[in-house]
């Protein structure tokens, strides 16, 4: 009897252990299940920063790398960073990201790193789904290959729509007073679902490393900015 009881106990323990480690289905995100990748997939290598990638834990630890917050890098540093890859990048875009980022309480300096990934250093070439004339800096509305995505009348409107989509993910509050809703997919997002940039992985883009890519690029921006001070 004791042997049978011991065997039963072991089997019961194994059963509950298996249940505790079983994978659980994630909550459905109505804005993130589409089979598409960032509009720009070419590696974003620095021309003279071999082995210069900073650990994510140094400047953007996963649990602390929040979408909401104040920008830490100025427009001049951002522009100098981008000009090394695209001399034609308009400084106005960086300034608008920081200005509107303050309005929405979003890290505009990180949002523009996401835009770099989506637009290929704002060149809109080599595979980006959106084009320069669309003023779409985040692949907004590109739900699958062949879909052109949303277009906006001005640079400011395009940046505003990008930040509004981030705001939808990171906050449950109403838009700031006086801000017109320009994001055509704002209502499709489960509000407050993503608090960190890493939470955008498999949501904003069906790419498990999407948040890491944003963080890595931001880390490189931080390193570049620090080296030029």
Region roles according to the model:
Residues 2-6, 18-229:
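Catalytic cores of secreted/periplasmic lytic hydrolases that degrade extracellular macromolecules
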Residues 8-16:
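Bacterial N-terminal signal peptides
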């Amino acid at each position: 009897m004791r042997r049978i009881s011991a065997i039963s106990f072991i089997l019961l323990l194994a059963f509950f252990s298996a249940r505790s480690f079983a994978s659980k289905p994630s909550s459905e995100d109505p804005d993130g299940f589409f089979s598409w990748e960032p509009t720009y997939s070419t590696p974003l290598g620095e021309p003279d920063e071999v082995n210069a990638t900073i650990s994510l834990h140094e400047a953007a630890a996963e649990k602390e790398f929040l979408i909401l917050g104040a920008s830490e890098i100025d427009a001049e540093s951002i522009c100098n960073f981008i000009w090394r890859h695209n001399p034609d990048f308009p400084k106005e875009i960086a300034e608008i990201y920081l200005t509107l980022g303050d309005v929405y309480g979003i890290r505009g300096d990180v949002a523009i790193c996401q835009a770099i990934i989506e637009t290929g250093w704002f060149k809109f070439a080599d595979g980006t789904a959106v084009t320069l004339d669309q003023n779409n800096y985040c692949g907004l509305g590109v739900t699958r290959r062949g879909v052109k995505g949303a277009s906006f009348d001005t640079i400011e409107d395009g940046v505003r729509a990008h930040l509004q989509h981030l705001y939808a993910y990171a906050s449950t509050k109403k838009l700031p007073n006086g801000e017109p809703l320009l994001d055509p997919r704002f209502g499709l997002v489960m509000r407050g679902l993503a608090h960190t940039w890493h939470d955008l992985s498999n949501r904003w883009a069906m790419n498990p490393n999407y948040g890491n890519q944003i963080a890595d690029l931001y880390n490189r921006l931080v390193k570049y900015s620090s080296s030029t001070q």
